[in-house]
């Protein structure tokens, strides 16, 4: 109703404060753009909002894009986004941008994991731009908030950034906080718990393990043959790249009894 009233055409983000105990909400503001958290909406609704925004700007209607309210499905599962910033955090939680050159940079991946970033190993940061370097979005299609958190925490442990100071440890501490995992938090959660959340914790570093797995996967998938049809022989005797392994699944034709 608000968008129709102002005759707005395009994609906008409307923010509310929600009181779950009273099942009540209050309007905050309307932004005539995507918000950085749009990836959460995309995950739970299986939409590409950036694509939709461009198509609407080019003249397409919501009806043509099948994005009218009646076409929007119920949110599926939970999605969590963490924002990795290049910043230094003092004991009171105040932040200031950090900078430098990335000596190592490797993003997490896997089912239900999305990583948006412009970083790469060797990248020299620019203080003229925002300190946000990566967004890690994880989705659990099940109605399980803890699973989405667990997946995001693991992804942060797989993320490798060296050469600049980031808020990675703070993010890991938040996701592993007992109250937070039990969905018991509010808009003042960070302010009230900042001292505890800034303490050093021994989080498992999975970045080297993950990178080794990626390299091994690429190595095993390499087909050393100029024949463009060599891929059809991959894993077969006489093919361009063969390696005996108990992990190779062998399929054989076998007659089955009726029924």
Model-identified regions with their sequence ranges:
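ATP-dependent carboxylate activation and anion-phosphoryl transfer catalytic cores
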Residues: 1-246, 252-259
């Amino acid at each position: 109703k608000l968008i129709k009233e102002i005759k707005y055409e395009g994609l906008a983000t409307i923010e509310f404060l929600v009181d779950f105990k009273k099942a009540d909400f209050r309007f905050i503001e309307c932004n005539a753009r995507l918000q950085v958290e749009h990836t959460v909406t995309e995950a739970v609704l299986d939409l590409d909002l950036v694509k939709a925004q461009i198509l609407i700007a080019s003249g397409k209607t919501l009806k043509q894009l099948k994005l009218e309210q009646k076409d929007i499905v119920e949110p599926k599962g939970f999605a969590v986004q963490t924002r990795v910033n290049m910043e230094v955090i003092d004991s009171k939680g105040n932040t200031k941008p950090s900078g430098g050159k990335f000596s190592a940079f490797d993003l997490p991946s896997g089912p239900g994991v999305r990583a948006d970033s412009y970083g790469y190993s060797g990248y020299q940061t620019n203080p003229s731009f925002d300190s946000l370097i990566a967004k890690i979005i994880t989705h659990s299609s099940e109605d399980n908030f803890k699973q989405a958190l667990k997946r995001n925490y693991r992804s942060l442990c797989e993320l490798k950034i060296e050469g600049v100071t980031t808020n990675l440890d703070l993010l890991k501490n938040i996701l592993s906080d007992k109250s937070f995992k039990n969905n018991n938090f509010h808009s003042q959660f960070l302010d009230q718990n900042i001292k505890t959340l800034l303490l050093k914790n021994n989080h498992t570093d999975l970045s080297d393990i993950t990178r080794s797995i990626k390299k091994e996967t690429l190595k095993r998938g390499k087909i050393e043959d100029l024949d463009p049809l060599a891929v059809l022989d991959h894993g077969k005797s006489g093919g361009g790249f063969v390696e005996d392994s108990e992990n190779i699944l062998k399929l054989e034709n076998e007659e089955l009894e009726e029924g």
